[in-house]
């Protein structure tokens, strides 16, 4: 059987790219079962977002290519910037400031070990 690249994307996640990248660094290059364990015990909110995307990638591998979970490892985790919501925050003396609420994207690529 030839090697297959499996991709899953999470777009518009309510976390900044820098916070997502802290968790993504934990799982790059790891086996999928080890990566899931890392994410399960990581206490950051963005670990839940990345865990969902990783589970989606594993489901894609099993449904589309019939690949066993034990043969997969995390080849790449790409974290990028998504849209930013702009909000107004009232300040003193009738002024206003902008508040930016940043969102992020995550792309996980799994590869099969033979």
UniProtKB/Swiss-Prot annotation:
User: Does the keyword field hold rRNA-binding?
Assistant: yes
Tell me the disulfide pairings in this chain: none
Could you list this entry's UniProt keywords, alphabetically sorted: Ribonucleoprotein, Ribosomal protein, RNA-binding, rRNA-binding
**What InterPro entries does the record point to?**
Ribosomal_uL22, Ribosomal_uL22_bac/chlpt-type, Ribosomal_uL22_bac/org-type, Ribosomal_uL22_CS, Ribosomal_uL22_sf
Instruction: Please explain the role this protein plays, according to its UniProt record.
Output: This protein binds specifically to 23S rRNA; its binding is stimulated by other ribosomal proteins, e.g. L4, L17, and L20. It is important during the early stages of 50S assembly. It makes multiple contacts with different domains of the 23S rRNA in the assembled 50S subunit and ribosome.
What the record says about family reads: Belongs to the universal ribosomal protein uL22 family.
State the name under which the record lists this protein.
Answer: Large ribosomal subunit protein uL22
Q: Gene name?
A: rplV
